[in-house]
């Protein structure tokens, strides 16, 4: 594959090209500080968890798929939608400084359907953030551009001081993938 980021992953020791997307976001938005508590949703294979951990954060990685261990990262294999109550019991009243979501559905090839499916994952990630994100915290979520991403962005603007669209240079140019970087959580009522 002629993809400079795929080629760089083995040289730089990252598990996935997506690590570079998070590095770009951190360079622009200063997402991480040493000692922060971070949740990485859709973590497997672990590129984002690696980046956050290398920044000195305490990372809990969640994914429905298995993930090989990363030094200093706690991994929980689970479905954040169907096992939400189990996670709520596990984390109880814990709050996290940053919640990252690079979750994406398996692509079916129909852009409109893929958009709907990722927006459902975005809503699940946001519900998770409503429960577990600390006041002033940061929420980063992957979206596919489509008819409802602006509505989702407007929903975020009611809960965060700043919300920005970001397309990393390391994203494939033909991809509709973008990220919403939401800073300064001011709160909202969880839906469940």
From Swiss-Prot:
It is found in: Cytoplasm. It comes from the Bacteria. It catalyses: uridine(2552) in 23S rRNA + S-adenosyl-L-methionine = 2'-O-methyluridine(2552) in 23S rRNA + S-adenosyl-L-homocysteine + H(+). The active site is at 142 (proton acceptor). The keyword Methyltransferase applies. This is Ribosomal RNA large subunit methyltransferase E. Pfam families: FtsJ (PF01728). SUPFAM superfamilies: S-adenosyl-L-methionine-dependent methyltransferases. The keyword rRNA-binding does not apply. GO terms for molecular function: rRNA (uridine-2'-O-)-methyltransferase activity. Its EC number is 2.1.1.166. Belongs to the class I-like SAM-binding methyltransferase superfamily. RNA methyltransferase RlmE family. GO terms for cellular component: cytoplasm. The gene is rlmE. It is an enzyme of class 2 (transferase). S-adenosyl-L-methionine binds at residues 46, 48, 63, 79, 102. Specifically methylates the uridine in position 2552 of 23S rRNA at the 2'-O position of the ribose in the fully assembled 50S ribosomal subunit. InterPro entries: RNA_methyltr_RlmE, RNA_MeTrfase_FtsJ_dom, rRNA-MeTfrase_E, SAM-dependent_MTases_sf. Keywords: Cytoplasm, Methyltransferase, rRNA processing, S-adenosyl-L-methionine, Transferase.
